[in-house]
């Protein structure tokens, strides 16, 4: 039973690490056209600042 719980714990940790890395890759890059992306969300304007799309409402 101990071996099974260690395996489940390792699988859980790996899935969390993979999820965090995938999310950071998506958020680290600006959208191709940040202004249009923000306007589609209802903002007045948008700019790429420090590799993040910043929307101004």
From Swiss-Prot:
Keyword vocabulary terms for this entry: Disulfide bond, Ion channel impairing toxin, Neurotoxin, Potassium channel impairing toxin, Secreted, Signal, Toxin
GO MF annotation list: potassium channel regulator activity; toxin activity
Disulfide bonds: 30-48, 34-53, 38-55
Primary location group: secreted
Residues annotated as signal peptide: 1-15
Site (Aromatic residue of the functional dyad): 56
Tissue: Expressed by the venom gland.
Compartments, record wording: Secreted
One term under GO cellular component: extracellular region
UniProt propeptide residues: 16-24
Coiled coil stretches, renumbered: none
SUPFAM superfamilies listed in its UniProt record: Scorpion toxin-like
Site residues by UniProt (Basic residue of the functional dyad): 47
Top-rank taxon: Eukaryota
Comment on protein domains: Has the structural arrangement of an alpha-helix connected to antiparallel beta-sheets by disulfide bonds (CS-alpha/beta).
Cited function: Recombinant toxin that reversibly inhibits the potassium current of mKv1.3/KCNA3 channel stably expressed in COS7 cells (IC(50)=150 nM).
Family: Belongs to the short scorpion toxin superfamily. Potassium channel inhibitor family. Alpha-KTx 26 subfamily.
Protein name: Potassium channel toxin alpha-KTx 26.3
Protein species of origin: Mesobuthus gibbosus
């Amino acid at each position: 039973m101990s071996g099974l719980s260690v395996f489940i714990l390792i699988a859980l940790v790996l899935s969390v690490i993979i999820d965090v890395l995938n999310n950071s890759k998506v958020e680290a890059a600006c959208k191709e056209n940040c202004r249009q992306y923000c306007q589609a969300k209802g903002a007045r304007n948008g700019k790429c600042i420090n590799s993040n799309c910043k929307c101004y409402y």
